[in-house]
Design a protein with these regions (language model features):
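Terminal targeting signals and extreme-terminal segments of soluble enzymes
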Residues: 1-265
Length: 265
């Protein structure tokens, strides 16, 4: 039974050690991790580092630097660019390479900004997204083990030609039984826009993302997230997926990914 994504092991200097559970396994390859768990774990360390800064995250960028194995990982966070109004913080994850040497497999950078009262001028580009009746999920990942078991998916009915919409809710905690923050919960599903917005059949094409960039003009609230996503595929094997993100209160931000598109042979 998958009851969390990572188990906390110990500290090693500036690094924290975690054991990756089966809940991190990718639907592309069960030997590597889905992008959302590493994004969420590094977001957690960045939020902990920023706890007394008076700043909050406005953007998260995950760069996947190589295949992330489902094994023990080492994670650290640091201040890349200090500032009282604008600061960049970063985190990286390292894991053993096939030859045994340790290498950095993923990195997250975050812009953190000072907050002030702008409640009287709040503006949203999109009206709130309301969850409707769940539709069938017509792709070959239905029933896939690993990460997809840790998220409750409700794909929505949309008209032909419109962006795909799905509501996602994490089913398990991020680390052990620790309660994740709402931003960490969002990070636990944000990388899934690739699956929500896919324009190709995964049994005919591989379209893996190299990054995930999340912008939030408002911090999320709750455990339910609506993703309205759509992929664009170029003529030379490169694509982009973009999405709007919603919680139960309304529009909260956008996500974008770069895709490597390859035809299966």
């Amino acid at each position: 039974v998958i009851d969390c994504l990572y188990r906390r092991l110990a500290a090693d200097g500036e690094f924290q050690l975690f054991e990756s559970t089966d809940g991190t396994r990718s639907n592309w390859d069960p030997e590597i991790q889905h992008g959302s768990p590493p994004l969420a774990l590094m977001t957690k360390l960045i939020e902990e580092l920023a706890a007394d800064s008076g700043l909050r995250v406005g953007r998260l960028t995950l760069d996947i630097l190589g295949a992330i194995p489902v094994t023990q990982v080492r994670v650290r966070a640091w201040v890349q660019r200090p500032g009282s109004r604008i600061s960049m913080m970063a985190a990286e994850m390292s894991a053993p390479a096939p030859g045994g040497a340790e290498r950095t497999v993923a990195r997250v950078t975050a812009w953190l900004l000072a907050t002030s009262d702008t409640a009287d001028v709040v503006t949203d580009r999109f009206p709130p997204l309301v969850e409707g009746e769940a539709a069938a999920v017509p792709h070959s990942w239905v029933g896939a083990k690993g990460y997809l078991e840790t998220v409750r998916w409700r794909r929505q009915q949309v008209a032909e030609g419109e962006s795909n919409v799905a509501w996602l809710s994490p089913r398990v905690p991020l680390v052990d039984s620790e309660a994740p923050t709402d931003l960490q919960r969002l990070a636990m599903v944000a990388d899934s826009i690739n699956g929500v917005g896919m324009a190709l059949e995964p049994d005919k094409f591989v379209f893996m993302n190299t990054d995930t960039v999340v912008h939030v003009h408002r911090l999320p609230a709750g455990n339910d997230f609506g993703l309205r996503a759509r992929a664009s595929i170029g003529p030379d094997g490169i694509g982009v997926t973009t999405a709007e993100i919603f919680d139960r209160q309304g529009f909260i931000g956008v996500v974008a990914q770069t895709l490597l598109v390859q035809r299966r042979t």
